[in-house]
Amino acid sequence: MPLLKLDQVVIKDLGKKQYQETFSAMKDFVAKGEDESIWMLEHDPVFTLGTAADQKHILKRTDIDIFQADRGGEVTYHGPGQLVIYFLLNIKKRNLGPKKFVKQLEDLVQKTLLNFQIQSNTIEGSPGVYVDSKKIASIGLRFSKGYSYHGISINVDMDLDPFKNINPCGYEGLQVTQIKDIYSNITLEKVKSVVEKNIQQIF
């Protein structure tokens, strides 16, 4: 059974964008309440704080910008080599509750990882996708006037060192991983292609 149909939803590849610029664009898009879209992109290095974020989970201050976002969740890191996918969807029209939507996004990530022979799992109460207890994909969402925005980030082929400066998603000692460490012959473009195909098949 398909998770949901994405009739007339445009999937856009935005390349590399500053987080703050994209954050403003998302809010403007959703405020109009007219269309739906899915954006795929990379961000320049940035730590983002969710609405539940506690500053104590920033372990070391660096020259990487810190931005307070309005998504759910704690602190995370975005940077080049990580695929970020924002889902700007009318979930009210699609009759999707937050829990069901999160489950569908996790399913999308897991299906994508399987394309690269990577087995993964989810953890009840801790949204995201894990490989051998290491987090490979994060989920953070916001819902406003029946729309979703923000989305998921998948670690593909990136510098993971900045994660050492935080407790990722608010969990002390949580380790992170990426596709490159498990499936060496990988590029961001390959993952984008698989994600887009899976969106068309699953959603």
Residue ranges, per PLM feature:
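Short, functional N-terminal and low-complexity linear motifs
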Residues: 73-79, 159-166
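Short conserved catalytic/interaction loops centered on acidic-Pro-aromatic/His motifs
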Residues: 120-123, 150, 161-166
